[in-house]
Design a protein with these regions (language model features):
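Core segments of cupin and vicinal oxygen chelate
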Residues: 2, 8-50
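Vicinal oxygen chelate
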Residues: 42, 86-133
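Helix-adjacent hinge/juxtasegments
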Residues: 53, 65-73
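N-terminal beta-strand motif that seeds the catalytic metal site of vicinal oxygen chelate
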Residues: 1-16, 72-77, 126-133
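Mid-chain, well-packed structural core segment of small domains
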Residues: 75-89
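Conserved beta-strand in the GNAT
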Residues: 51-53, 122
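Short, charged/polar surface micro-motifs in flexible loops or helix N-caps
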Residues: 46-50, 57-59, 82-84
Length: 133
């Protein structure tokens, strides 16, 4: 069975984005690369790798206007306390986007935010269908 263990997100401010996810979610910096096509900072919670990328141009990215593109659509973090995490997100410069679902006691209930670059992510206490803590 395949398991999701990596997601890559293109950001505007590489160091600022890394500091945001380190501060809010206690992710650890596990690597950094500076290549001709661009740079990357790699963070992890010990299970999944979050690659934050900043491209210099289209080469290697597969994206048109890669130097100006940011994002994947969104990704999510399962947390112990939605309210406490929301406070940490907002204190670090993240902005509330919207809530999806009826009750935080149910799987797939999520609170969506935008990080300082505008990348959408969500938090959930129960996680998502097919996931476990």
């Amino acid at each position: 069975m395949a398991r999701l263990r990596h997601i890559a997100v293109v950001v505007k401010d590489l160091e600022g984005a890394a500091q945001f996810y380190e501060k809010v979610f206690d992710l650890k910096r596990v690597g950094e690369e500076h290549l001709e096509m661009g740079s990357g900072i790699y963070l992890s919670d010990g299970v999944i790798n979050l690659a934050l990328l900043k491209y210099k141009g289209e080469s290697g990215s597969g994206l048109k206007d890669a130097a100006n593109f940011v994002g994947a659509h969104h990704f999510g973090f399962q947390v112990d306390d939605v309210e406490a995490t929301r406070a940490r997100i907002e204190a670090a410069g993240g902005k509330f986007f919207f809530t999806l679902g009826k009750s935080k006691e149910e799987a797939n209930f999520e609170v969506k935010f935008k990080d300082p670059d505008g990348v959408i992510f969500d938090i959930s206490e129960k996680g998502w269908l097919g996931t476990s803590k």
